[in-house]
Amino acid sequence: MRNYLLLRDRLTQVWLNKYSITVTILTAKIVLFNYFIIRILRYTEKYAISSCNGLDQVNRKVYDDLPIFVNTLGNYMIRKSMLESVEASLRGLEILIDASEGLLGFLVDLYLGTYACLLISAVDGAVDVATNTTEHILEAVNNTLIEATRGLDDGLNDLTSLINKGGNRLSSIFKSDNSVAASLSKVNFTVKGLRNIHLSSKINDQLQYMADKVPSFDDLKSETKDLISIPFYHVKREITKVNAESLLPDTKILYLRNNTDTTLYPICGQYIPNIKKVYEHLIHILKVGNILVAILGIFIALFMAIPSIQKEYQESKRLNNVQDEVSQYIDNKEFMSSGDNSSLNYSPFNDSKFNLAESYQRNFNPIARWMTIKMGKYFGNDETEYSERLQFCMLYIFSSRSSTIMAMGLIGLITVAIQLIVIQIISNYLSNTGKVHIQLQASNDEINKMIKSDINLWTSLANQYVNGTEANLNTQVFGWITNTTASVNATVAHAVDKIEYILASSFNNTPLYKPMKTVVGCAILRKLISVENAMTWINNEAHIKLPRINTTELINIAGHTKMLPSSNESHMFDQVEKIVNIARKTALNELYVPLALIGIWLTQIPMALLLSWRRCDTTGKT
């Protein structure tokens, strides 16, 4: 029995060769990687379905409860803001009415008090001057007339005596003529009347009466203020009795969506079968890929056993070749002498002319030998030293250890390449699954459209509510302002008429009427007319305009703030894409290992060159 393995013994272990084991490890790596992706996809599928169901619940709450809550809150805020606006308007009106009443009273005091006082003082002074002047004139005239009468009386007395004397004589002549006697008597009577003539003091009395009758306007001022205060009093009393709630329209006009209107949910649930289909298709691809990789790996591993069998035969043949070379060398030795027993102890391993290692490398490293022959032909250098150095470099680079590093690096590159191919297949499939995305996006657009429709309806009814509040406020509250200004205008008109009546009754047909009317018109009437114009302007402008809700701005705000949650479909595909990206990054990170191994193997090239040049002789052992 031999103490070493024969060829048939080694053939029983050919399936344990390094190539089959490497292929098996490579296959297991790819299969495990695919199963890792499958498990992640399973988890993501469960997460997506769970999130989809959760999204349906959220959308149901959002679409059912949130709009109702927002409607209720918005309606409450609108009603509250309208109520506060009405109450603030009422309080402001009270202040405005008090201020207006005080201002008008001040104007009455100013125009009918100050100016009238000055005017009356001026008139009183003028009448007093006229009365005093008249008294002096009357006194001077009367004194002059009295003195003249006295002088005339003395002269006439003498004339009368003379005439009477002559008359006695003439009477005897004209006894039958009574006209002469009458004329004489008349002359005496005329003188008598002249004696009694003087200017009457009634003129002075009339002037004094006129001075006492100059109007003081006190009654007019009091009457005007009383008339002005009447509408203000009634307005303030009505405002204090106003209930702000009564000015607001019925809240039933405001829109409140019924939760039974919902017809779109489940939004995402109806697409769960499509989501499952996407994941199942991906998982099916990976499972089929695993089966194919496993089958292919088994066949490759079995196929790798064939080269191992061939290698065993070749190694056996190479071993025989080495043995033949040794035998041939021994046969060629010239030591065949019958008397010499040294041939019995001869060993080629001790012969310096026979290099057993070179024979082994030449027969057991065919790759290095083949590379040496090809490179020698390529560079066209057949020198022995160059050929030996090249052969040494090839043997060093493709030694068993270096070849193992190189093989591991290449296998790693192949593994990473297969993983990247699988990842790219999944990525391509995801890029072709936009149909579900379009369907879900269409559903999302439909929901947004319905939300916008609800917003339009709500804002329309809310604006109707604001319109009703504004109309009630302008009619029931600011209508009093209209009535008040109309009453003030009527009072002012009455005051103007009364002033004109007083002037007419006091100064008509007198020299003072025209200047008095001019002065009063300038000092008082123009001011009252200005007040009347101001009241007319207030009457035309006294109304409130409440702001309306802008539908476009509200929809834009809702769009900018992402008020409606987006569909879960994009989130689902984002998760799958993240997994694919993570797997791609993992594969790319694994690429560093085979590249590092290839880099280590490449470092053997400069080391081989360095060692080949440092060899002292080309025939030495390596």
From Swiss-Prot:
- One annotated GO biological process: plasma membrane fusion involved in cytogamy
UniProt keyword annotations, A-Z = Cell membrane, Conjugation, Glycoprotein, Membrane, Transmembrane, Transmembrane helix
Ranges in the Extracellular compartment? 1-20, 124-288, 426-590
Q: Which residues cross the membrane?
A: 21-41, 103-123, 289-309, 405-425, 591-611
Q: How does it sit in the membrane?
A: Multi-pass membrane protein
GO CC annotation: mating projection tip; plasma membrane
Topology check: give the Cytoplasmic ranges: 42-102, 310-404, 612-622
Q: What is its main location?
A: membrane
List, alphabetically, the InterPro entries matched: PRM1 (IPR026777)
Cellular compartment(s)? Cell membrane
The protein's recorded glycosylation sites are: N132, N142, N188, N258, N467, N483, N489, N550, N568
Family per similarity comment: Belongs to the PRM1 family.
Q: What does this protein do?
A: Involved in cell fusion during mating by stabilizing the plasma membrane fusion event.
This chain belongs to the protein called: Plasma membrane fusion protein PRM1
Instruction: Report which gene this protein is encoded by.
Output: PRM1
